[in-house]
Amino acid sequence: MRLTVFAGREAYPSLAAELEGAEVVRVPVTARSRVRRVLAEQTLLPAAARRARIDLLHNTLNTAPAIAGLPQVTTIHDVIYKRFPETAGLLNVGVAVLVPLAARRSRRVLTDSEASKEDIVRFLGVEADRVDVAPLGPGIPVPAEPVPEAELREELDLGDAPLVLTVAAKRPHKNLARLIDAVGRLPEDVILVVPGFETQFEDELRRRAGERVRFLGWVDDRTLDGLYRAATCFVLPSLAEGFGLPVLEAMLRGTPVACSRISALPEVAGDAAVYFDPLDTGEIATAVERLLGDEELRRRLREAGLKQAERFSWESTARATVESYRSALSNRS
């Protein structure tokens, strides 16, 4: 198999240096403008694909050229925008057109979980036997030298209080408002740590959060790794997830997990989490309080989480992806 990777201006230098055995082709477009990226996907990408004489085009982020001139596979990670239109904001109109179009134009659709497959079939009308599931592998890399916890706490001014960590975009379907309210019911020495980029929804979250909630903004991978390790537990209260990669990241580091009993999260966490109803603030608080107060439960979940995390690897993702390629090229559907 010959692999050709099409990369924009920002990604090209690192991909060209790192991807041995693959041809990396630079496409003159910036990833900083979503509108320009979509326009390039519809115009520059098909032309580059034809020049490269490839047999199959894999689009990895939900959308695809309307006219590619060759077979396509498209990864649609989720269709959460269908359940929560406010998540996509002003871009929702474009998303509502481009994602279903990509599904129709592709011989195969790849997605991250059985739950996302069900949503793609339901909301986009794609035939179930045309959708392949390729669960993701580990997220951020484990550093060779993790940041010492004392150093991390001092740098981020976290003191010595027990930490409850969540890693989620500040958008409505991530349900952070209920988590903040739930933490307000916990013992006073607990701190909820919320890393991640600011969004238009952050002001509302800050208004309901007290001093026990720390919004850190963007953090690098080494810092995020340190937060997972320093946390007494990790909580993901989402109302919808296409996969739930932070759950896997937490389990890989031996951090006990509490998460919503919805969509893809049980596929990822298996029996290695405390589950709750994400619409019930009291149930969220009870789940977190159980983890904070029960050392034996944390030990069991730590062991179960490490074992559960072993089920996921990028090698498995690659095998499922290649099988989808074969199906597309043989025109099986």
Residue ranges and their predicted role:
Residues M1-S333:
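Carbohydrate transferase catalytic cores enriched for Leloir-type hexosyltransferases
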